């Protein structure tokens, strides 16, 4: 059996005391019906769509307003990949997405700043 040096136990205790417990945030979800107004090709491929109806999963969720135009890159239903462009809807089509976002603190250039991680997965028809 290997013995650890005597100084390793206090170090481990000190490290545990200084590490704050990780806190998981909750994804905020909004069910949105959209009308595709444009399939943008340059500079970055994305969809532009007008919000027809938006239903938050809970009262505290911030959904885009009805009538607003949003731009996004469509994702697969599991949020794991961008939807292949051949499966993107065309201009004029009505679609449904389950918009998800997570607010948090991002780090960059040594400065922390508030940020939002967003996902735009399609809902199976």
Where are each of the predicted segments found?
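OB-fold/S1-family single-stranded nucleic acid-binding modules
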Residues: 51, 103-125
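Bacterial N-terminal signal peptides that target proteins for export
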Residues: 1-11
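Cleavable N-terminal signal peptides
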Residues: 11-12, 22
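Beta-strand/loop nucleic-acid-binding surfaces
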Residues: 60-86
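Structural detector for short beta-strands of small beta-barrel domains
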Residues: 26-58
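N-terminal signal peptide c-region/cleavage motif recognized by signal peptidases
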Residues: 17-21
């Amino acid at each position: 059996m290997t013995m650890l040096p005597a100084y390793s136990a206090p170090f481990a205790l000190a490290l545990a005391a200084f590490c704050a417990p990780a806190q998981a945030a909750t994804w905020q979800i909004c069910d949105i019906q959209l009308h595709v107004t444009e399939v943008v090709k340059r500079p970055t491929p994305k969809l532009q769509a007008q919000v027809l109806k938006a239903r938050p999963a809970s009262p505290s969720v911030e959904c885009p307003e009805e009538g607003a135009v949003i731009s996004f890159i469509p994702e697969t239903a599991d949020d794991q990949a961008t939807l292949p462009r051949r499966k993107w809807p065309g201009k004029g089509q009505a679609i449904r997405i389950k918009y998800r976002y997570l607010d948090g603190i991002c780090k960059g250039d040594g400065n922390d700043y508030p940020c939002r991680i967003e996902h735009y997965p399609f809902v199976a028809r």
